[in-house]
Amino acid sequence: MNIQEIISDKVTQALVAAGAPAGSEALVRPSAKVQFGDYQANGIMSAAKKMGLPPRQLAEQVVANLALDGIASKVEIAGPGFINIFLDAAWLAAQADAALADPRLGVARVEPQTIVVDYSAPNVAKEMHVGHLRSTIIGDAAVRTLEFLGHNVIRANHVGDWGTQFGMLIAYLEKVQGSSETGDMALADLEAFYREAKKHYDEDAAFAERARGYVVKLQGGDEYCREMWRKLVDITMRQNQRNYDRLNVTLTDDDVMGESLYNPMLPGIVADLKAKGLATESEGATVVFLNEFRNKEGEPMGVIVQKKDGGYLYTTTDIACAKYRYETLGANRILYYIDSRQHQHLMQAWTIVRKAGYVPDSVSLEHHMFGMMLGKDGKPFKTRAGGTIKLADLLDEAIERAAKLIAAKNPELSGDELKALVEVVGIGAVKYADLSKNRTTDYIFDWDNMLAFEGNTAPYMQYAYTRVASIFKRAGIDENTLQGAITLTEEREKALATRLMQFEETILSVAREGTPHVMCAYLYEVAGLFSSFYEACPILNAEEESVRASRLKLAALTARTLKTGLDTLGIKTVERM
């Protein structure tokens, strides 16, 4: 049920009937204040200007043609030409009843698209660190949202599994192959392994020569080198999967589409760019000059697609990547959850992709960029010693802090119940603190704020859900067997129902813009409206049975909306806190 869309269609029809030009937009939005109704149509001024009419005159004509009988109880013209629409309480109650009866809460399935979502993208032979957190959890929230709406989503974990460093790693793996630990080494050891390999490469000329030879062999498909390379990849991805599982992220090994996947395509792409006259030789390298981007001298910027020594760059891989996602995966839309510092690089690659005809304009290429995670000092979040914080260590600390918090609040909890609750709250706090911020901005990582039981935090939202669910437990009522109809006679009943019925509008916005903070803000508002309703409107102690039944249904719809919304974010809920 998309009330905004229903009203928008009605206002658009009324605009046409009033003689507005084709394409005039209704611009229907939820009203910011209750005195302006539940929805407001803001498109009158623009249409009136095109028609040469006073806005209020056009607004009067639109209202005269507005077919909202049964949907709106009142329609008013305000200010220079805004149309305020007040929803009919009986109609709204019927929609809320229908939403509660629907496992999807009234959210319609969309016409499915094939959408590729590129996110997480850790590097092989290195442990995941806090810098991977935002891409991983924001991307996964987008995936969950798109799948809920019915899209065919292809997860693409663009793992850094290729490059000259693998010659060095293979050479060192060969050197220590006799060690019984090597085959199953933990990734923490593999980080030390990487440092030792680099040290040998820098200090031992013979080792460096052998490493360079292995790069050539690996790129040539040498079976021995491929086997050693695969071992390094497998060790890394096993550890990464543990992080994904702890984070309640839906990525698996089946979603890995590493850089190595695109290597066979690179020579053909460079040759094709040359044949199309897009790439030229410049100082021994193959370069695409783009008029859309200018260097400091104001000249077209040169983007290297093949180095003088024959090697390829990330841009070449990203060109192949976009081409593959359209031609092989059949993408209608491709979303990249990569930090904002990569924006120009991606724009250059996509400009080449479009010019070469690899991806048509009908396919959307979208950089859903995000800012940095900062410490309280406003600098990139690091250890006290200035080092990179490992993601696993961050999650361990989140659980430790949540354990202390919950032990202080609920000392009677113990055993498996306590362990499960601590993990849900600790991991949820880290994720929600990130997801609740506008992804385009930097944000301050603050343990005290994210674990607080007040404000727009995971603990508050998880508690809000359990608070609603506890109503049914206390009364011994199964929320799936509720009888009667929803009626909305109190102001706070209607305010809660109106916001609950905007769930579809919210989830469509998140899917369109890739902005999970919009869902967080919505759920936080729903929780607040429920608190106001709960305080003002007795539920179990309502004087009339019909009112009690109605309010129980509103509570059930609230609980299901909170749970479903949090699930689209990848945040778990519990029945008791």
Curated annotation (Swiss-Prot):
EC number: 6.1.1.19
Family statement drawn from the similarity comment of this UniProt entry: Belongs to the class-I aminoacyl-tRNA synthetase family.
UniProt protein name: Arginine--tRNA ligase
Designated gene of the protein: argS
Subcellular location: Cytoplasm
Cellular component terms (Gene Ontology): cytoplasm
Record's catalysed reaction(s): tRNA(Arg) + L-arginine + ATP = L-arginyl-tRNA(Arg) + AMP + diphosphate
Principal subcellular localisation of the protein: cytoplasm
Motif ('HIGH' region): 122-132
GO molecular function terms attached to this record: arginine-tRNA ligase activity; ATP binding
InterPro entries linked to this entry: aa-tRNA-synth_I_CS, Arg-tRNA-ligase, Arg-tRNA-synth_N, Arg-tRNA-synth_N_sf, ArgRS_core, DALR_anticod-bd, Rossmann-like_a/b/a_fold, tRNAsynth_Ia_anticodon-bd
HAMAP family tied to this protein: Arg_tRNA_synth
UniProt subunit comment: Monomer.
Keywords: Aminoacyl-tRNA synthetase, ATP-binding, Cytoplasm, Ligase, Nucleotide-binding, Protein biosynthesis
Lineage, top ranks: Bacteria, Pseudomonadati, Pseudomonadota, Gammaproteobacteria, Enterobacterales
UniProt GO BP: arginyl-tRNA aminoacylation
